[in-house]
Amino acid sequence: MKFFDTIVSPATVIGRSGIGIIRISGISVLKIIKKFLKISMKERFAYFSSFYDVKNNLLDQGIALFFLAPKSFTGENILEFHSHGNPIILDLLIKNILTIKNVRIANPGEFSKRAFLNNKIDLVQAEAINDIINAESHLSVKAALSSLRGTFSKKINKILFNLKDIYSEIEAIINFPEELNDLNIQKNIKKKLSFIIKMITNLLDETHKNYIFSNTIKIVIAGPPNVGKSSLLNFLSKEKVSIVTNIPGTTRDVIHKNIWFNGVCCEFLDTAGLQKSQDIIEVIGIKLAKKHIKSCNHIFLMFDVTKKKMINNNFIKNIVNNLKKNQNITFIFNKIDLINKKPYISIIYKKFECIYLSLKKNIGIEYLKNKILEITTLHNNVESTFLAKKRHISALKKSLMYLINGKRNWMKNLYLELLSDDIRLSIKYLLKITGKFNSEDLLDKIFSKFCIGK
């Protein structure tokens, strides 16, 4: 795809540093070399050069790199200035470059967008670039790099190959009606559909798992009022994040705090006490707490060991019975110093750990720390083969839905025309993942989240 303008942007964060990089992509690159470097450049060679302004005054000295289209990241001519990392120098360089006709400042993610539009990368790989930059754990970096290498895209393309194969086969059969009632053909279609449905189902499971384990671990601290939830968050974060009082219902909103354990970013959420309330604001807080309980990875369900009425079996059973496949609970009984008990761990409901401790007296804290270490170690040990996003999961679900419904309806009425339409829609949603079937709105939404210079 040919663009008639040239884009320029800092590729490094603006600030004082050893090196500052300016990236330029487009048809005006050769003019910029001639005007501001005044040297002849071979592609993919590093040149130590002086950088001049429009009046031939020296601005800086540094390294210049030139990449000739189409063998560049964007598929266009690319030039990079590696100057001293002074924001004044970078600003002067960019202002002078902008004097060249049809050169403008790049939008966020525009370099990656041009790479996508020039078929240098697909949409999954483009997203992976941004994910590498914003990753919050080594696991996320590893998964994003895998996506950048095309691991996820290859899996999608393999399914697409099989879908397109059966689609073309069905279209051919439709054009030869005498074969519609051939039992061998029907059996073959059914077999192929079942195989593809299994492929998508397996990939959807893998995608969902990777989405969970490639992201921050979300741990919700929940329980009745005044059991020590806010004290626990303050203890873990080593600062006063939540207000702690003896008044029930102090926490009404959800308090978020990201804390690093074992090389993993854990998002802890202090939530409103779960109880029946007439207070409108508190009710909203309780609804938010329940919402986060449903979407988190792990629940720290806290109780005051001295208040046995709070430990209601139905209350616990309701949370336990609604746990999702990848969720877990640790029960925490606080304030054991008030009943002269030593800290210990037991098992509740046959499989859930129950930790008895005192935050106030700093008793049993090692059990809690070991539990968090166990959670993060488990997270680190899961092999995340690629980085998954919500839109990938949504598209896979829709693709699978059309295929399952199409197969079921076809087996009832044997209308291949309707099955063909469902397969076409299934293909459409898979193509949306890699960006082969896209809308400008989708692209703008994705690339607007990128930083400037990527």
Curated annotation (Swiss-Prot):
It is found in: Cytoplasm. (6S)-5-formyl-5,6,7,8-tetrahydrofolate binds at residues 23, 80, 120, 454. Its cofactor is K(+). GO terms for molecular function: GTP binding; GTPase activity; metal ion binding. Keywords: Cytoplasm, GTP-binding, Hydrolase, Magnesium, Metal-binding, Nucleotide-binding, Potassium, tRNA processing. GTP binds at residues 226-231, 245-251, 270-273. Homodimer. Heterotetramer of two MnmE and two MnmG subunits. Residues 216-377 form the TrmE-type G domain. Binds 1 potassium ion per subunit. GO terms for biological process: tRNA methylation; tRNA wobble uridine modification. This is tRNA modification GTPase MnmE. Gene3D superfamilies: P-loop containing nucleotide triphosphate hydrolases (3.40.50.300), Probable tRNA modification gtpase trme, domain 1 (3.30.1360.120), tRNA modification GTPase MnmE domain 2 (1.20.120.430). The gene is mnmE. Exhibits a very high intrinsic GTPase hydrolysis rate. Involved in the addition of a carboxymethylaminomethyl (cmnm) group at the wobble position (U34) of certain tRNAs, forming tRNA-cmnm(5)s(2)U34. Mg(2+) binds at residues 230, 251. One of its GO terms (cellular component) is cytosol. The lineage of its organism: Bacteria, Pseudomonadati, Pseudomonadota, Gammaproteobacteria, Enterobacterales. Its EC number is 3.6.-.-. K(+) binds at residues 226, 245, 247, 250. Belongs to the TRAFAC class TrmE-Era-EngA-EngB-Septin-like GTPase superfamily. TrmE GTPase family.
